[in-house]
């Protein structure tokens, strides 16, 4: 009995293998399509092709062109078989497109079923590679837009805005430091004293108020106290300090008076900055915020003349 069972198992195994062959052949037959028999294919921007020997690829793939790949992205393209040139299928691909754009080079790419040059291809493996070009109308719109700061200048403006964002932190720190320095200079040299001191006669009988020698007017923005002769007394200097300043300090480096000059310049600059009127930014919906007077004109971006069905012609590429 054991020998009979073994004999039947040996006979059944080949039969089971033969029964699976038609199923595999049917599956391959359904997925294996003669390229010349394909009459039309519909391709979508958000889908990938089928794949068997290689990796899937996008059904619609832009590979360049004068218009760039991001200005207009077709969502659905349909390609029709227009004949056989003796080597491969020739295609006409159509899509609804703005009048500013057109197809350049188009090429349908399909995966050979067993090898790249196989006349049979995998069903659903075809995709489209194309270039996107500007029409004459598109070139005119592009030139008009660049003159006015629109139609493509958003890319450069967004880059400059991102650069400004990166530098805002360091600029704010520098501005804060300058404001602190200017405020310190202002409080130290330019603001009035909190306690008004009355002049006193010199211990040796010399009264500064009794002197009749005229002194030069103080520089703009400074208190007269800093040029008054009592300053010598306050800082412990002798009467001859001011008369000998030109000779005794002409060869010395920057000191107290240099600091005063620097404070005056900073005070002038910040005062001039505060005196400038504020100009509110003008927001242009085409190019973004701007302070330029030219942008206050009633500018409207150039409008397209409409949409049409654009066609592109090309052959087949195998992979």
Swiss-Prot record:
Residues 27-171 are lumenal. It comes from the Eukaryota. InterPro entries: SARAF (IPR009567). It is found in: Endoplasmic reticulum membrane. Residues 193-319 are cytoplasmic. GO terms for biological process: calcium ion transport; regulation of store-operated calcium entry. Residues 1-26 form the signal peptide. Belongs to the SARAF family. This is Store-operated calcium entry-associated regulatory factor. It comes from Xenopus tropicalis.
């Amino acid at each position: 009995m054991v020998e009979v069972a073994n004999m039947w198992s040996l006979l059944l195994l080949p039969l089971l293998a033969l029964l699976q062959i038609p199923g595999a052949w049917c599956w391959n037959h359904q997925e294996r399509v003669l390229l010349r028999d394909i009459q039309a294919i519909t391709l979508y921007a958000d889908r990938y092709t089928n794949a068997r020997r290689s990796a899937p690829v996008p059904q619609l793939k832009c590979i360049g062109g004068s218009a760039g790949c991001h200005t207009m992205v077709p969502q659905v393209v349909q390609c029709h078989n227009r004949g056989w040139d003796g080597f491969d299928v020739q295609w006409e691909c159509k899509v609804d497109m703005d009048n500013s754009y057109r197809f350049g080079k188009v090429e349908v790419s399909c995966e050979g079923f067993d090898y790249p040059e196989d006349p049979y291809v995998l069903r659903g493996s075809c995709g489209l590679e194309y270039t996107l070009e500007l029409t004459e109308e598109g070139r005119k719109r592009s030139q008009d837009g660049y003159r006015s700061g629109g139609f493509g200048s958003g890319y450069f403006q967004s880059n400059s805005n991102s650069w400004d964002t990166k530098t805002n932190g360091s600029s704010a720190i520098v501005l804060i430091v300058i404001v602190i320095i200017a405020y310190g200079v202002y409080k130290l040299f330019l603001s009035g004293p909190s306690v008004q001191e009355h002049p006193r006669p010199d211990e040796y009988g010399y009264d500064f108020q009794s002197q009749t020698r005229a002194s030069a007017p103080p520089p703009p923005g400074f208190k007269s106290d800093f040029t008054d002769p009592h300053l010598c007394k306050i800082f412990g200097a002798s009467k001859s300090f001011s008369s000998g300043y030109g000779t005794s300090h002409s060869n010395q480096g920057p000191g107290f008076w240099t600091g005063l000059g620097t404070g005056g310049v900073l005070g002038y600059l910040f005062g001039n900055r505060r005196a400038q009127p504020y100009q509110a930014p003008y927001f242009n919906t085409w190019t973004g915020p701007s302070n330029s007077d030219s942008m206050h004109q009633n500018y409207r971006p150039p409008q397209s003349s409409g949409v049409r069905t654009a066609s592109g012609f090309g052959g087949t590429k195998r992979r």
